[in-house]
């Protein structure tokens, strides 16, 4: 198979092979392509063609032609599950919103798998949108610039499945993002590290319930039960119902 790292700007919209390559880093020079191939250099040309063809087909096919193609060439169910998690935790520095922070893999049969990473900008640390806690999960990002998610959601059964996954994450019976259970996990983790917070550097010696100070929604908290500022409660209010 072929593994790629998608760097900032990886919109899955432009099929140009000029955006694809292998990262080259020396002491004096760094070249990082938008689509950074993680396989053998001997396979690069074929991998470029495969990726370019995938991007071309994703953008050019419509209607049943697109539906049939994407069902064959992509693990759509995994992608929808993954995106439900992305949106639920408030991951704005992602593919849909910012063309960023994901890998993808084509298996030996040519099927595409989406692999996100870098979840530091979550749980109330909001930017590039007005409020990552209550942003519409059906219009999370830049549909025109990063078209894959929005195009999938034009297919009724995929949209319904995505909404189901969002609701499953919030459902009390699954013990995932339901506010009481989420807060209990946070408390358990805090208890585990509390005795180690004090350190000989004198830095970061306090546990605070605040998002990163450079975000645009500094009011968010993970503790408490206020619908005005608790991230879990506000996120639940934004989820469309089944």
Summary of predicted features, one role per range:
Residues 1-54, 124-128:
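Surface-exposed loop and adjacent secondary-structure segments within mature catalytic domains
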Residues 38-96, 101-242:
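Middle-to-C-terminal accessory/interaction subdomains
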């Amino acid at each position: 198979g072929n593994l790629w790292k998608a760097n900032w700007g990886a919109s899955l919209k432009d099929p140009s092979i000029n955006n694809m390559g292998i990262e080259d880093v020396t002491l004096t020079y760094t070249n990082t392509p938008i689509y950074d191939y993680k396989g053998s250099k001997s396979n690069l040309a074929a991998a470029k063609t495969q990726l370019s063809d995938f991007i071309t087909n994703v953008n050019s096919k419509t209607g049943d032609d697109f539906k049939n193609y994407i069902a064959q060439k992509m693990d759509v169910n995994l992608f929808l599950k993954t995106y439900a998690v992305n949106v639920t935790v408030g991951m704005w520095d992602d593919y849909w919103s910012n063309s960023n922070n994901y890998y993808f893999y084509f298996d030996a049969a040519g099927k595409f798998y989406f692999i996100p990473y870098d979840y530091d900008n979550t749980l109330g640390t909001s930017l590039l949108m007005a409020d990552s806690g209550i942003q519409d999960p059906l219009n999370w990002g830049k549909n025109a610039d990063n078209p894959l998610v929005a195009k999938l959601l034009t297919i009724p059964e995929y949209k319904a499945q995505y909404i189901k996954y969002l609701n499953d994450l919030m459902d009390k019976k699954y013990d995932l993002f339901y506010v009481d259970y989420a807060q209990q996990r946070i408390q358990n983790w805090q208890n585990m590290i509390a005795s180690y917070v004090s350190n000989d550097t004198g830095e970061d010696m306090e546990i605070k319930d605040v998002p990163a100070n450079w975000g645009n929604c500094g009011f968010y908290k993970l503790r408490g039960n206020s619908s005005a500022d608790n991230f879990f409660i506000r996120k639940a209010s934004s989820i469309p119902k089944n």
